[in-house]
Amino acid sequence: MIEADRLIAADNPTFREEDVIDRAIRPKKLDDYQGQDHVRSQMEIFIKAAQMREEALDHLLIFGPPGLGKTTLANIVANEMGVNIRTTSGPVLEKAGDLAALLTNLEENDILFIDEIHRLSPMVEEVLYPAMEDYQLDIMIGEGPAARSIKIDLPPFTLIGATTRAGSLTSPLRDRFGIVQRLEYYKVEDLQHIVQRSADCLNLSMESEGALEVARRARGTPRIANRLLRRVRDYAEVMSDGNISSEIADKALNMLDVDVRGFDYMDRKLLLAIMEKFDGGPVGLDNIAAAIGEERDTIEDVIEPYLIQQGYLQRTPRGRIVSDRAYLHFGIDKPDK
């Protein structure tokens, strides 16, 4: 598989080496999909049932933090169903005609995957409702008094929507998904299997303890685990004999400024800012964003979820508060209040 990808990359300079590697290590079947056991077992049943009835799979909404494999799961569903998948994202679909063009080109039981579906415009969303429910498009032709509505029948299809913000979806859209799956942060042992599988796909020499070291610092996120693996590979090839042991992985990750808890520079910057500038909180999100020079959405969607899940940060009605665990991690005395 990777050799074919390398040939494609050689012919097309727009392909980056990182993209080629991503495609090579991405699982194609549910059997290769590590972790998320509840999602995998449910999807196996739903897919088999749809195949037995020779129907399109019910519309599927996948939500969870970034990097947990929403796009990967959508492609796996397409492979398991044996159908084509067309991929787009919410911000790209600016007009109703953009969505109509995609829908009218679908074949029976095909999949339309919309990433960041919470960012669909209301106009485009209105077109989706009859398409999802009745497999019909309602299109307005002409303008003013001469305008008329025509209905276009669509083949049965599956819409897969992915979002990091399920709460931002409108109720009418959310209610039209027959299957809703939430992806959780991965356990360390599941990430270790993912790292080891990726290393095998890339023909890397990697010890199990080396894979464990990478997995422990990957913030429960496969995308981060695979990114760290590529950088550890670089370090091992330049500074050693290419074999990735626990010691080599530790040195490489320390060089990358990723600590034993998986915190990177921005994680530490956020926690330290709350502790040192705001006496541990509570402090509002706007103040944190100004203090660390980061966007609100990035803090809320990318940085905070893992810190909260690990018990280092709390969201309260009055603002963000760091926990005692954060003070212990940094060796800082908690101020008396």
From Swiss-Prot:
<keyword id="KW-0233">DNA recombination</keyword>
<feature type="binding site">
    <location>
        <position position="320"/>
    </location>
    <ligand>
        <name>DNA</name>
    </ligand>
</feature>
<feature type="binding site">
    <location>
        <position position="71"/>
    </location>
    <ligand>
        <name>Mg(2+)</name>
    </ligand>
</feature>
<feature type="binding site">
    <location>
        <position position="186"/>
    </location>
    <ligand>
        <name>ATP</name>
    </ligand>
</feature>
<keyword id="KW-0238">DNA-binding</keyword>
<keyword id="KW-0227">DNA damage</keyword>
<feature type="binding site">
    <location>
        <position position="296"/>
    </location>
    <ligand>
        <name>DNA</name>
    </ligand>
</feature>
<dbReference type="GO" id="GO:0006281">
    <property type="term" value="P:DNA repair"/>
</dbReference>
<keyword id="KW-0378">Hydrolase</keyword>
<dbReference type="GO" id="GO:0016887">
    <property type="term" value="F:ATP hydrolysis activity"/>
</dbReference>
<keyword id="KW-0963">Cytoplasm</keyword>
<feature type="binding site">
    <location>
        <position position="70"/>
    </location>
    <ligand>
        <name>ATP</name>
    </ligand>
</feature>
<feature type="binding site">
    <location>
        <position position="176"/>
    </location>
    <ligand>
        <name>ATP</name>
    </ligand>
</feature>
<dbReference type="InterPro" id="IPR003593">
    <property type="entry name" value="AAA+_ATPase"/>
</dbReference>
<dbReference type="GO" id="GO:0006310">
    <property type="term" value="P:DNA recombination"/>
</dbReference>
<feature type="region of interest" description="Large ATPase domain (RuvB-L)">
    <location>
        <begin position="4"/>
        <end position="186"/>
    </location>
</feature>
<dbReference type="InterPro" id="IPR004605">
    <property type="entry name" value="DNA_helicase_Holl-junc_RuvB"/>
</dbReference>
<dbReference type="InterPro" id="IPR008823">
    <property type="entry name" value="RuvB_C"/>
</dbReference>
<feature type="binding site">
    <location>
        <position position="71"/>
    </location>
    <ligand>
        <name>ATP</name>
    </ligand>
</feature>
<comment type="subunit">
    <text>Homohexamer. Forms an RuvA(8)-RuvB(12)-Holliday junction (HJ) complex. HJ DNA is sandwiched between 2 RuvA tetramers; dsDNA enters through RuvA and exits via RuvB. An RuvB hexamer assembles on each DNA strand where it exits the tetramer. Each RuvB hexamer is contacted by two RuvA subunits (via domain III) on 2 adjacent RuvB subunits; this complex drives branch migration. In the full resolvosome a probable DNA-RuvA(4)-RuvB(12)-RuvC(2) complex forms which resolves the HJ.</text>
</comment>
<dbReference type="InterPro" id="IPR008824">
    <property type="entry name" value="RuvB-like_N"/>
</dbReference>
<dbReference type="InterPro" id="IPR027417">
    <property type="entry name" value="P-loop_NTPase"/>
</dbReference>
<feature type="region of interest" description="Head domain (RuvB-H)">
    <location>
        <begin position="260"/>
        <end position="337"/>
    </location>
</feature>
<dbReference type="InterPro" id="IPR041445">
    <property type="entry name" value="AAA_lid_4"/>
</dbReference>
<keyword id="KW-0067">ATP-binding</keyword>
<protein>
    <recommendedName>
        <fullName>Holliday junction branch migration complex subunit RuvB</fullName>
        <ecNumber>3.6.4.-</ecNumber>
    </recommendedName>
</protein>
<feature type="binding site">
    <location>
        <position position="25"/>
    </location>
    <ligand>
        <name>ATP</name>
    </ligand>
</feature>
<feature type="binding site">
    <location>
        <position position="315"/>
    </location>
    <ligand>
        <name>DNA</name>
    </ligand>
</feature>
<dbReference type="GO" id="GO:0000400">
    <property type="term" value="F:four-way junction DNA binding"/>
</dbReference>
<feature type="binding site">
    <location>
        <position position="223"/>
    </location>
    <ligand>
        <name>ATP</name>
    </ligand>
</feature>
<dbReference type="GO" id="GO:0005524">
    <property type="term" value="F:ATP binding"/>
</dbReference>
<dbReference type="Pfam" id="PF05496">
    <property type="entry name" value="RuvB_N"/>
</dbReference>
<keyword id="KW-0234">DNA repair</keyword>
<feature type="binding site">
    <location>
        <position position="72"/>
    </location>
    <ligand>
        <name>ATP</name>
    </ligand>
</feature>
<comment type="function">
    <text>The RuvA-RuvB-RuvC complex processes Holliday junction (HJ) DNA during genetic recombination and DNA repair, while the RuvA-RuvB complex plays an important role in the rescue of blocked DNA replication forks via replication fork reversal (RFR). RuvA specifically binds to HJ cruciform DNA, conferring on it an open structure. The RuvB hexamer acts as an ATP-dependent pump, pulling dsDNA into and through the RuvAB complex. RuvB forms 2 homohexamers on either side of HJ DNA bound by 1 or 2 RuvA tetramers; 4 subunits per hexamer contact DNA at a time.</text>
</comment>
<dbReference type="GO" id="GO:0005737">
    <property type="term" value="C:cytoplasm"/>
</dbReference>
<dbReference type="GO" id="GO:0048476">
    <property type="term" value="C:Holliday junction resolvase complex"/>
</dbReference>
<comment type="similarity">
    <text>Belongs to the RuvB family.</text>
</comment>
<dbReference type="Pfam" id="PF17864">
    <property type="entry name" value="AAA_lid_4"/>
</dbReference>
<dbReference type="InterPro" id="IPR036388">
    <property type="entry name" value="WH-like_DNA-bd_sf"/>
</dbReference>
<keyword id="KW-0547">Nucleotide-binding</keyword>
<feature type="binding site">
    <location>
        <begin position="133"/>
        <end position="135"/>
    </location>
    <ligand>
        <name>ATP</name>
    </ligand>
</feature>
